[in-house]
């Protein structure tokens, strides 16, 4: 007869291992993205075997589905991962790694001075602390214009990533196969034009409103038309504004010391949070 009592396996199911706050502080989210619109003390579960396999599937990484599926699995209070802003994605990935593999990340680095291979353990909590100290600058003042911006959503980011990859393949793989020089030049020119359009698209998508003389314009069509016909200096200012925010949110370089007694020099190392290798080894 089947035992109707609670399964003894229940207490061995995944439990939250980490709790963290979203660095964006929920600033850019509408109802339904986060459960209860809560962005603090989010519980993080460790990855399952299936989650880890997804991170090793190239197509799922490129289209963002691997990351989105892992977020749904490990942080169920995030209801719509593709509507997350990119400011939160790295902190989310760090917290999932901590919940799955522990608080440290092992890295190797070849000393540029003596060529010795060194191994280091990097505490990941420092990155969560870094993100929580960061502030997103959402305002650009350009002459009489007050421009409000927002970081891209994860959906926008993955779309740009897919297009960028397809253009790179076109230039590196398809173009060299064209034997006629004029046709090849035209093909490459057309691809470069598309890349230029993509860069403008990133800038346009970042602009949420433009205020002039006390009137605020939020209509995306009007904003696009205005920017398409604006002077180059405004576009450059917007591009710099976006790049400055991106740089501000990047993981700081790690200062490490070479373990070779004959060297012992300090080096700065950039730690990669790219999903393809960040989750490769525990």
Where are these regions (language model features)?
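Long C-terminal interaction/binding lobes of large macromolecular proteins
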Residues: 1-282
């Amino acid at each position: 007869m089947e035992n109707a009592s609670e399964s003894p396996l229940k207490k061995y199911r995944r439990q939250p291992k980490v709790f963290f706050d979203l660095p964006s502080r929920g600033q850019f989210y509408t109802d339904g993205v986060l459960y209860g619109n809560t962005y603090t003390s989010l519980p993080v579960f460790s990855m399952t075997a299936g989650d880890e396999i997804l991170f090793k599937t190239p197509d799922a990484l490129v289209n963002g589905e691997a990351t989105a599926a892992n977020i749904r699995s490990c942080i169920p209070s995030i209801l719509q991962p593709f509507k997350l802003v990119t400011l939160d994605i790295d902190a989310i990935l760090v917290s999932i790694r901590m919940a799955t593999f522990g608080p440290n990340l092992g890295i190797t680095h070849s000393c540029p001075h003596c060529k010795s291979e060194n191994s280091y353990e990097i505490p990941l909590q420092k990155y969560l602390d870094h993100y929580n100290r960061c502030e997103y600058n959402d305002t650009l003042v350009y002459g009489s214009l007050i421009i409000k911006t927002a970081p891209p959503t994860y959906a926008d980011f993955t779309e740009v990533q897919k297009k960028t990859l397809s253009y790179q393949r076109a230039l590196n793989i398809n173009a060299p196969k064209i034997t006629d020089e004029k046709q090849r030049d035209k093909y490459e020119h057309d691809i470069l034009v598309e890349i230029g359009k993509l860069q403008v698209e990133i800038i346009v998508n970042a602009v949420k409103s433009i205020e002039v003389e006390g009137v605020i314009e939020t209509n995306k069509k009007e904003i696009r038309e205005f920017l398409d016909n604006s002077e180059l200096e405004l576009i450059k200012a917007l591009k710099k504004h976006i790049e400055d925010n991106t740089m501000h949110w990047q993981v700081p370089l790690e200062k490490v010391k070479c373990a070779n007694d004959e060297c012992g020099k300090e080096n700065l190392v950039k730690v990669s949070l790219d999903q393809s290798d960040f989750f490769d080894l525990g």
